[in-house]
Amino acid sequence: MHRLVVALVTLIGLTGAVFLAGYFLLFSASNDRAAALAPADSVFYFNVYLQPSSGQQMNLGGLIGRLPGFADEASLDEKVDQVVQNLLGASGLGLDYREQIKPWLGSQIAVAGRPADGDPTQPDAVFIVEVKDRALAEAALGELATQGGFSFTAETYQGVEIQTADTGAYAFVGEMLVVGESSVGVESVIDVDRGAAALAGREDFRTTMAGLPADHLASAFVDLGALAEATGTADQLSAFSTAGAALIAERDGIRLSGSAPFEIDDASASSAAGFGLGGEPSSLVDWMPEDTIAELVIFGLRQTLEDAEDAAASAPDGEQITSALDTVRALASFGFGIDIDADLLPLLDREVGIALSGLGGALPSGQILLRPEDPEAAEAALVRVVDRLVATGASERTEEGPGAEITVLSISQVGEIAYAVRDGVIILGLGAEDVSAALQAHADGRALGGSDRYAQTFEVAGERAGNEAFVDIGAVVDLMGATFELPDDARDILAQIGSFGFTAPSRDDRLEFHAVLTVDEP
């Protein structure tokens, strides 16, 4: 895409960044003018508002004020402008945000993607930007084109002048600037302005957006049904039709919340089973040591893997994937005598957790925790796996742990793998110390699930059930040390970020998700 279009797209992308754009992206009631111009066959739609609302402005101002260098509210506007300007400068586009963009930029920016040549997997994206001063916008676009050495040809479509080049086009449709990769996308918006069906008129779009929190910073809509049909995954995603999400500023962090209607009568048996498990909060976090810095819990992992394999089999080039999986099964069977489907998958049929607490030399320290549907059958399957590994040359010993016996396997060219079983939970680690740490955390009640940082993260999320993830951002940055080369100001800002959390609860007839990024007090 030529320099002008890249410049506008870059601006829109920068405006969508969580904290910088967060200062601007403040909800402006119900006047979504861009959705009224987006084509009805759009498969995705992202929208942000630049008009402040008092509650969101207060929360965002407080969050940004916690970051190093942003504590002075009087100069907050200037500092945010400077950061945006620096980012544009780093892009190499030669744009001056204060002089060339900010004076004409209105209160709304949106992007809609519609099928190119009827293929939803190859959407033709158009950007719809509200303009508060068209004369300034036209002058700025002309200046940007001159700076880039590009020339445009004017053509008229349904009474609207479109400026076109080999790799991009733009037009003013009323008070909106429409930018596309080609004139086709721009023409589709003009068609809507002249009476063609709009995304805003779709019942599923209105229903999805009405289900989002009213006071938000930005919103998104995805036509899952169209994408599933186009990608050959309609059977696996038959229970889903659309999805929507909203970005919200809370007092202690930024929250992205969304949902997708779930038609259980249309779902496959495995999808329905996985959905049913998502209504309960994870219990495995009560076994993870308090110093855990990152964790992931998945409910129904077995069902997810089986669904993914079925989807791969029906996808283009899926035969290569299924053939590779068959090879893995054969190697496990002939090399170790392990039947993956009978011995390993039953361990993953309910709740699976991974916890990371640090790096010990070249290997991570942490645990894999399993709470299977049938603990006794799963433990028997685990014993079979151990017996077969011992039969192929591994050595086995046992140690006493806090409340449970720990079995340690030493496998040539692999190292040590330890495990213990207690209260229906299987704990695995790369050594007895990791397993013992989990047993001790549960016995003492000093586990991650009871820590303040974990509790605060999911308090901002407002929910905790189903699949989840947690990352202590500051601890991870400290752990990585000099591994990442970051500017000092970026490292200071990351140090002020508290944690990331994600949860995906099942609620009645919908699947929700909530992702949060917290910001610590100075």
Residue ranges and their predicted role:
Residues 413, 432-433, 439-522:
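Long, C-terminal catalytic modules of enzymes
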Residues 123, 176-177, 245, 250-265, ...:
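Short, hydrophobic/proline-enriched secondary-structure or compact coil segments at domain edges
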Residues 253-255, 291-293, 351, 363-365, ...:
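Active-site lining segments that contact anionic ligands and/or coordinate catalytic metals
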Residues 74-80, 183-184, 328-330, 421-440, ...:
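Extended, charge-rich low-complexity interaction segments
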Residues 44-46, 93-207, 345-456, 515:
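Single conserved position on a long alpha-helix in the C-terminal lobe of the eukaryotic protein kinase
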Residues 34, 112, 168-169, 244-248, ...:
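Short, surface-exposed charged micro-motifs
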Residues 2-125, 129-161, 205-240, 251-362, ...:
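Structural boundary/hinge residues at secondary-structure and domain interfaces
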